[in-house]
């Protein structure tokens, strides 16, 4: 008999009562070649014929079961066919369909093209919706049956529905496929959510507790599908987190002026990467602050730490509160952190002793003001600490009882900063004497350092500096003035100049520099600071044009210094005097060296230079420092003698106000300026002492020891202690400056790879990450662009990648990559800008990624064309081995970090695809596992977007990576192509 269509063939089989295998053989004869059974809709046709009557046709159903078992039809076509049936009143038909689902719902798979795998996701979503509708209908019937007194039938069907639902949803693979389907078809997911709500309402009145709990479990599983990637277990067994500790110490010691937002982002990143519970995270921040306070050197550093702890950190926590979900929870976490902190009595007692007050009390008050703690919590915690303090060792001796604690002074200085900024906004020409009174008051004692620390911690230092630059600019020249206004103008110029120098030396010159505006005139102080002021790592040329002004001005200045009994003030152009002083000093030095001037004359000249306006002495020493560097050993004496004279006490009478206060600041500026050159020339100059070390972290390296030894030594000490202290941070920073990023990073990684104990390697990673925060961007480029590729491509080094150091290095690499990638669009911090930045062009030639000049690695990978058509979809771009989500998102490949990441993932892809296995393949697995562990989702904005799509199919061949969650995490599901790749990989698991 000639069969015309599928329906006829099925009917003939039924009439002639063919067995299932007979039916399959005959079907293949009727439809020999051409279209597949899915295209002919075989599953649909069989179900349609089987479900005609009130009960299903068992023979035709047996054909369908045979077709499923022998894979004549795909799972997706069967699920789609089932989900079309909607007459839930036909119990036997519904039960037959549930039985068919039971055959395969927990072992779905698809080994076809990507489109077929996406089809399976969609079919599963439809089937889930059908199951929910079916369950709701069964529950409704059960309710009606209970009312009529015949519950048994409805209960049996409801139990079957819930069983199939549970079986389908308990498979992680199925939930992953549904996750993809949800992104493909948002409207269908909305329908599922509605069905779930409806089902919940019906089941709420159900008396059977077993069925109700089963239904609730299914509901929970469905609701977990959209968030199945963001669940991470927190580390409850650890109590110390050295990375958080070190990041706080680093910021407090070296970056008080840094933006609060960038610190918040960095801390949030660490919290997420290390899965730290919030109370322990906040506790670690407070612990680090107290340690910083206790070990900070007396003077400016102590004030900086106080401002950081009591002004900046509460602001950081306020921002962290916005990041965390739920205000109430965060205040509870902060309260919990304080409860833990109060148990660290020795730490708090030591801090109280150092600060001469109850530190915790002040801290609690600040947190209360910022809304981080409720009033009740503040009072409760204060009472607990008060009770503890009664048993504390005796506070500082009686002589200190009248000294106000720094914390109180800093908290009082903060509103004063705002008032001073308002005062500085007024018209300077109207009441210069009043302004001078305010500034004079700022110079007394430690007022200036207090105000600067408060301004730095609250982000106001830049506007503070800007106001002083404007004042300095305003006072450079005054016309037709009498003696009184001239002396006020000289004082305002001098005080603003000294303050700005002090700010630049204490907080970095970046605070002073304005945003570059085209066409705008650069203020005098900025020009002088950039071209003439000595700083760490800045070499000045004493013959630079900036030191060689108009010769007539120089001659008149030399005459003025040499002949007058004191400096004239009226109509003096102070900026010109400051720029001419260097050339004048050169003339005077030459005259002295040639015997034209005697030492007494030099003494009179230096007294004239510093007698009225200390700024001139600062400018003179700035040039002398540059000049001394260029002289031979036997030529330096007179220049150094002149620096001594300028830094020494004044021999004549001074006549201008606030002289002693100005000299104190001048001497601290001169001491910092001369530090480098005095060390290089092995000279000593005694600067008048203020009783406080003005440069506590300077010259920390031991003399005559190779820097590699110093690096390994200090790292070993830090590792043994388990945390980084402020002094070590400064030593690491000096070594980074001295040895360069590659040397620094390479040697520390060698130290990490020497570790053989697991707990040591993990501690080393936490500490290294925080040390690398000194210049995370550059370190990451070196680590991912040079060191890792070197280890992965050289078989003689593979042994060093064994576990545990290999696992640790993978963790460190991922942490660095994530931190740099999340922050590299932001601003480089003050301390990082000082370093030489590596040219972008270096990275473009090292890692070419354009079509014109493909790198060796790109060519090597592109030649592997076996996988080229893995996703032969006409709608998507052709699939080359290197195509990644970043290319579809058109990420800027001129950026060095993007290039390095893209190349690293190409290398990973080639290692996974190669036939040689070893520690390097194991390392790649650890690297990817860590990526998955740290990431919320491998979408746009994540480092995994640089991974070629073809890597996914290679990765799932590695046993540890062959899980649906891993596939979802490493693919960019925001892209259709990403979803296809994920569906194909998961469906094949």
From Swiss-Prot:
A motif (LXXLL motif 2) lies at residues 344-348. It comes from the Eukaryota. A motif (LXXLL motif 5) lies at residues 788-792. Keywords: Activator, Nucleus, Phosphoprotein, Repeat, Transcription, Transcription regulation. InterPro entries: Mediator_Med24. A motif (LXXLL motif 6) lies at residues 857-861. It is found in: Nucleus. A motif (LXXLL motif 4) lies at residues 557-561. A motif (LXXLL motif 1) lies at residues 128-132. GO terms for cellular component: core mediator complex; mediator complex; nucleoplasm; nucleus. One of its GO terms (molecular function) is nuclear vitamin D receptor binding. Its main location: nucleus. The modification Phosphoserine is found at residues 862, 873. Component of the Mediator complex, which is composed of MED1, MED4, MED6, MED7, MED8, MED9, MED10, MED11, MED12, MED13, MED13L, MED14, MED15, MED16, MED17, MED18, MED19, MED20, MED21, MED22, MED23, MED24, MED25, MED26, MED27, MED29, MED30, MED31, CCNC, CDK8 and CDC2L6/CDK11. The MED12, MED13, CCNC and CDK8 subunits form a distinct module termed the CDK8 module. Mediator containing the CDK8 module is less active than Mediator lacking this module in supporting transcriptional activation. Belongs to the Mediator complex subunit 24 family. This is Mediator of RNA polymerase II transcription subunit 24. It comes from Homo sapiens. The gene is MED24.
